[in-house]
Amino acid sequence: MADQLTVEIIAAIKNLAQSENGGRIPAAIGDITADRQLTSLGIDSLALADVLWDLEQAYGIRIEMNTADAWSNLKNIGDVVEAVRGLIAKEA
């Protein structure tokens, strides 16, 4: 079972994926879990920058990487969750 942070980040990424795909996610994608690759949801580097900005605002953190670095390091939703979790812990 996913923890609250994972659920919230999946919801944020799902909302972004829907907006990137004309308001819906194709049924062929299936369930969105932490293992889901960002590219499989139609999230490109520009959309990833939006996600990172939203997460910074939501959790009061600063993600110290440019979008190119983020794109190479954050391949799936779980990578995003763990990056945010680490930054939240550092801020505490």
UniProtKB/Swiss-Prot annotation:
Where are the O-(pantetheine 4'-phosphoryl)serine modifications? 45
Q: Per UniProt, what is one Pfam family of this protein?
A: PP-binding
* Gene3D superfamilies (alphabetical): ACP-like (1.10.1200.10)
The alphabetized UniProt keywords are: Nodulation, Phosphopantetheine, Phosphoprotein, Plasmid
Sorted alphabetically, which PROSITE patterns does this protein's record hold?
Answer: CARRIER (PS50075), PHOSPHOPANTETHEINE (PS00012)
Determine if Phosphoprotein is one of this entry's keywords.
Answer: yes
Asked whether the UniProt record includes Membrane among its keywords, one would answer no
Domain Carrier positions? 4-88
Mod. after translation: 4'-phosphopantetheine is transferred from CoA to a specific serine of apo-NodF.
Give the protein's function. Proposed to synthesize nod factor fatty acyl chain. Involved in trans-2,trans-4,trans-6,cis-11-octadecatetraenoic acid biosynthesis.
Name assigned to this protein = Nodulation protein F
Q: State the organism of origin.
A: Rhizobium leguminosarum bv. trifolii
